[in-house]
């Protein structure tokens, strides 16, 4: 008998409950003696009935086969640990014509799916696959209904607060809102706002019609390259860079002057030049005045 089996038998006795070893040994020996007379002439060690130690105590020793030679070679000093196994070894070998069967083999026959009611591998795999498919279908059906409501919960608190604030400042337009709507039919539009190009275009020639915004492309022809550097690619590249920067600055200055002419600016004092930051402030004030005028016009349309 292996030493591991002795340790497991010590666990059987449950020494943590303050039961001394001699009392537990007597209890175990008397139990084996009582059961021996009832099962000695029966073929109890078979696939339908487990060994006495497994049947009565509900434990499975970790041994493959118990042979008489193992019990005979046990030293005398280890008798306290292996004394209960002598009776068990005699019980296992009571039938000389029956081959010895180990605990592992008997356990395998005992725990077979047909005898213990356990599911086979194919049955357990089929049930697992069915449950996985059922869960995946439920998740797909629930995600479709939760997408429209869960976007606010996914956002962090800061983003959610910002989203709520934007909705309050710029509410969505609904078909039943009180906001006045522009007529969609061209017959309802007044004739003074109808032209050949389409509705909402005043007829007067004095209305503002800005040209499309475009950034001019700067090109320097090769004919403008000086003759003394045209053979040196490095100098040609530097010269083109300088010329392009000059043209870009001139174009920026002209565009700024056109912008300043289109806004109201304070008069010059003593012929001095007005600083650019003051001119840009005038541009911002005009933009704000345009926005205020649009809001006032919107209120007039809402009240009408």
From Swiss-Prot:
A GO BP annotation: phospholipid biosynthetic process
Entry GO terms, CC: nucleus; RNA polymerase II transcription regulator complex
GO molecular-function terms, A-Z: DNA binding; protein dimerization activity
Main location class: nucleus
The organism's place on the tree of life at top rank: Eukaryota
Domain bHLH positions: 236-290
Self-association and partners: Efficient DNA binding requires dimerization with another bHLH protein.
Chain's role: Positive regulatory factor required for depression of the coregulated phospholipid biosynthetic enzymes. Also involved in the expression of ITR1.
Protein name as annotated: Protein INO2
Organism: Saccharomyces cerevisiae (strain ATCC 204508 / S288c) (Baker's yeast)
